[in-house]
């Protein structure tokens, strides 16, 4: 039997997600897939919401290749490329946008967000409008 760790659970959950979709993704089905008892999953994830948050993070880590601006990049180009990359990441898994829409930023993503805001501020945005611009792009891509 393979050692059950967080990465193994996430990989199996992403496979299952593609097969059955978000509404049918249950911890019971995931435990069956992993050949473990359901409580074993709670060692790694407190609840289904925590699992879904981890899935959203994994999708972005795997496929969102333009989350940071390039040196001397125009802010318009960055926002466009960021949106396209974000969209590609969410479309790479069934119900990816729905899963991401229910998440909140987590500590590992704070640095990325701060870099994006600093970049936009250096391009002439005030901090408030930089956040608005990033949120607008995110909401446009996700559809919320």
Locate predicted features.
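N-terminal intrinsically disordered/low-complexity leader segments
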Residues: 1-4, 15, 64, 68-71
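Short acidic alpha-helix initiation/capping motifs at coil-to-helix transition points
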Residues: 31-32, 108-113
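Hydrophobic alpha-helical connector segments
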Residues: 65-110, 127-130, 134-137
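Short, basic, alpha-helical segments at the C-terminal edge of helix-turn-helix-like DNA-binding modules
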Residues: 58-62
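Helix-turn-helix
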Residues: 8, 12, 16-50, 54
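Hydrophobic alpha-helical bundle segments that form small-molecule/ligand-binding pockets
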Residues: 112-144
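Generic alpha-helical structural context detector
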Residues: 53, 57, 88, 135, ...
């Amino acid at each position: 039997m393979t050692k059950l760790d967080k990465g193994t659970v996430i990989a199996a959950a992403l496979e299952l997600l593609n097969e059955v979709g978000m509404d049918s993704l249950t911890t019971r089905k995931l435990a069956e897939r992993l050949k473990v008892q359901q409580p074993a999953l709670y060692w790694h994830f407190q609840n289904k919401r925590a699992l879904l948050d981890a899935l959203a993070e994994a999708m972005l880590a795997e496929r969102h290749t333009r989350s940071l601006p390039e040196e001397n990049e125009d802010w318009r180009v960055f926002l466009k490329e960021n949106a396209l990359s974000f969209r590609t990441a969410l479309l790479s898994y069934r119900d990816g946008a729905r899963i991401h829409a229910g998440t909140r930023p987590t500590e590992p993503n704070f640095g990325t967000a701060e870099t994006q805001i600093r970049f936009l501020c250096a391009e002439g945005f005030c901090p408030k409008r930089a956040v608005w611009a990033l949120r607008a792009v995110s909401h446009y891509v996700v559809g919320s």
